[in-house]
């Protein structure tokens, strides 16, 4: 057992020991089906705190040699699957968190050198008797180990895209990194499965991907991987029953990620919840914005204030409850190459700041928690008319409760005239006005409009 080669099952054991653990071992059934096939290259991208690292720990515990993990999977879904024992602890696992290497390095070249040096150290330490052709070449060392042992490798890479987030403007560094991954992984007999996770999909240059052997499962199109990252509605209902929490309140705060999944060759929309936030709300009983503990509004502010091609108008409409059609096909899968408004909106989907509805190709603000992040972001910008309307919505709601009809009418008219995108006689514009005017209702828990009787 090494630091990077067959690191053991401690990470997965800690997940199991946590107060709340939701069984996602169905992912193993799926990866077992892909072993040693042309589909053995998998890249899963999700927002932060959607269970990506936990899944990598689980796969390391299941596949890795030099440890016995059978007891950890007792009473979990994968134990009932025919492939469970066939692959349990049968592989050499190389597990890397790229953020660890990047943080310890002064350059991309230094980072790539560290990766090769440290993995080679574990391999040559574990297989001392093998004669190596070149102990400084990671690809050749892994070829030699595989030739001598016939034990193939499972490669698990967490935070694969961290370099693209920290070296946003350095295309040379990005290409060096992608070239390294391609050289290490593509068309290699020693690879039984290569599994990468991150926030962003694989970077595209022009119309081509540098790692075109990977099947990608993103927030835009997660398909059969959808239910393994994030909590499903059924899982959240079970937690609400266990902790005696309001399911309706949980849904209002943390639901809204409508992703396309495939079950028994049938496409369907799956509702996903932000797991970190649900866990915090279940344990504390307090429905609040837990998103800002993983991301700050500054991250959102950077992209919203770009205001590409009517981006500001789109955000206002989404705050008012509307959905905006977008084309995700032009996005370059990085954080800087924006050609139009839709590229920015697509990035916000990958970051978790927008939901994406596959059937009609629209984006929307998914829930109260994320709506508050938008308010936090634009409150620090020069969107004064939007902030004024949101602040006025509190007074408008009070007037509605008090039956002050003239005040309500004036408030709606004011919101309509203040937001420049709204056309006075347009029906959809009126709907947007009313929703934005009553924004407060959407952000106050248990807030319902009273029914007046005469």
Language model: regions and residue ranges:
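Phosphate-binding site recognition
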Residues: 1-434, 438-447
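Short acidic loop-to-beta-strand element that houses the catalytic metal-binding Asp/Glu
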Residues: 453-454
């Amino acid at each position: 057992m090494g630091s990077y080669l067959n690191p053991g099952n401690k990470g997965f054991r800690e997940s199991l020991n946590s107060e709340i653990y939701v069984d996602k071992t169905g992912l193993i059934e799926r990866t077992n089906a892909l072993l040693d096939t042309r589909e053995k290259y998998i890249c899963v991208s999700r927002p932060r705190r959607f269970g990506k690292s936990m899944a990598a720990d689980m796969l390391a515990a299941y596949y890795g040699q030099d440890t016995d993990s059978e007891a950890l999977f007792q009473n979990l879904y994968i134990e009932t699957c025919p492939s469970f024992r066939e692959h349990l602890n049968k592989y050499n696992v190389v597990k890397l968190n790229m953020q660890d290497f990047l943080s310890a390095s002064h350059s991309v070249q230094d980072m790539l050198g560290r990766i090769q040096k440290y993995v080679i150290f574990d391999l040559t330490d574990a297989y001392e008797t093998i004669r190596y052709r070149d102990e400084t070449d990671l690809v050749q060392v892994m070829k030699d180990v595989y030739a001598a042992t016939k034990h193939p490798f499972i490669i698990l890479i967490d935070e694969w895209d961290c370099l693209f987030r920290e070296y946003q403007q350095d295309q040379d560094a990005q290409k060096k990194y992608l070239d390294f991954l391609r050289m290490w992984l593509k068309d290699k007999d020693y690879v039984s499965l290569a599994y990468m996770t991150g926030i962003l999909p694989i970077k595209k240059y022009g119309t081509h991907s540098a790692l075109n052997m990977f099947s990608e499962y993103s927030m835009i199109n997660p398909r059969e991987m959808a239910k393994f990252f994030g909590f499903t509605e059924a899982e959240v209902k079970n937690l609400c029953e266990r902790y005696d929490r309001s399911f309706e309140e949980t849904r209002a705060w943390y639901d809204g990620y409508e992703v396309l999944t495939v079950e028994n060759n049938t496409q369907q929309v799956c509702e996903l919840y932000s797991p970190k936030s649900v866990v915090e709300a279940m344990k504390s009983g307090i429905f609040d914005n837990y998103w800002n503990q993983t991301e700050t509004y500054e991250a959102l502010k950077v992209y919203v204030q770009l205001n590409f091609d009517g981006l500001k108008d789109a955000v206002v409409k989404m705050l008012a409850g509307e959905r905006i059609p977008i084309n995700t096909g032009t996005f370059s899968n990085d954080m800087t190459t924006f050609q139009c408004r839709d590229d920015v909106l697509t990035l916000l989907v990958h970051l978790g700041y927008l939901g994406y509805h596959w059937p009609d190709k629209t984006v929307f603000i998914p829930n109260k928690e994320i709506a508050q992040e938008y308010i936090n972001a634009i409150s620090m910008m020069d969107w004064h008319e939007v902030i004024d309307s949101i602040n006025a919505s509190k007074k408008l709601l009070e007037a509605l409760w008090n039956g002050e009809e003239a005040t309500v009418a004036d408030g709606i008219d004011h919101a309509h005239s203040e937001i420049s995108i709204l056309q006075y006689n347009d029906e959809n514009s009126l709907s947007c006005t009313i929703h934005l005017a009553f924004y407060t209702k959407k952000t106050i828990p248990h807030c319902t409009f009273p029914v007046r009787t005469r």
